[in-house]
């Protein structure tokens, strides 16, 4: 709710037309009820799009293993460390973990294969499946109209997190690298790269 409030303060009170979950980590879906009303999703007014097997992996990783992972996350991300005039110790992905309410609305539309397309509010999206990378169910998306490539959490401005201390599933670096290469081959004309946790990369050479 705070994030969309910040957006609307600068861009106007624009309605949410769709929700896309890129992968199964709670920091990428847990704020959904602050953005849309579940009743609107259930009524078919707002689609919620996610990669195949999203719910299975979201439940297994965040519910079944959740209590243990939450405890270990305090060691991985350091949310209890003090802040000071020179800043704070963090994990690189962000300054700290969220302490807000987590929520989840089940997807209404699953992306099943690389190359699947959806038109959302008149804008075309092309999806690329990237399972068993930074998350067990993950996908990238490309918006041709803006030449913008969204790599979910698979291309951020830090070292890839292959072995999470909190106990999330170990990542496959070979698969991860193959999906990055495939994205470059599929969407080589991209001019903007979005990595979600960090600032965009602008210009084809930087992408």
Stretches with model-predicted labels:
Residues 2-47, 188:
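Active-site metal-binding motif and surrounding structural segment of the metallo-beta-lactamase
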Residues 23, 48, 111, 141, ...:
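Divalent metal-coordination and catalytic microenvironments
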Residues 49, 55-131, 175-179:
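Metallo-beta-lactamase
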């Amino acid at each position: 709710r705070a994030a969309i409030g910040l957006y609307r303060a600068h861009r106007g009170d624009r309605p949410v037309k769709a929700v896309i979950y890129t992968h199964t980590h709670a920091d990428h879906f847990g704020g959904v009820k602050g953005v849309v009303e579940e009743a609107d999703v259930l009524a078919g007014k707002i689609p919620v799009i996610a990669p195949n097997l999203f719910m299975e992996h979201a439940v297994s990783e965040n519910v079944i293993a959740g209590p243990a992972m939450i405890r270990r996350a305090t060691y991985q991300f350091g949310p209890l460390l003090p802040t000071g005039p020179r800043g704070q110790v963090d994990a690189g992905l962000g300054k700290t973990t969220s302490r807000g309410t987590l929520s989840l609305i089940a997807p209404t539309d699953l992306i099943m294969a690389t190359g699947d397309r959806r038109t959302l509010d008149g804008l075309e999206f092309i999806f690329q499946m990237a399972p068993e990378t930074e998350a067990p169910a993950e996908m990238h998306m490309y918006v041709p109209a803006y030449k913008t490539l969204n790599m979910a959490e698979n291309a951020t401005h830090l070292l890839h997190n292959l072995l999470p201390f909190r106990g999330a599933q170990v990542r496959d670096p070979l698969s991860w690298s193959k999906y990055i290469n495939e994205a470059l081959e599929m969407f080589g004309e991209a001019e903007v790269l979005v990595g979600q946790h960090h600032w965009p990369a602008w210009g084809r050479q930087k992408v």
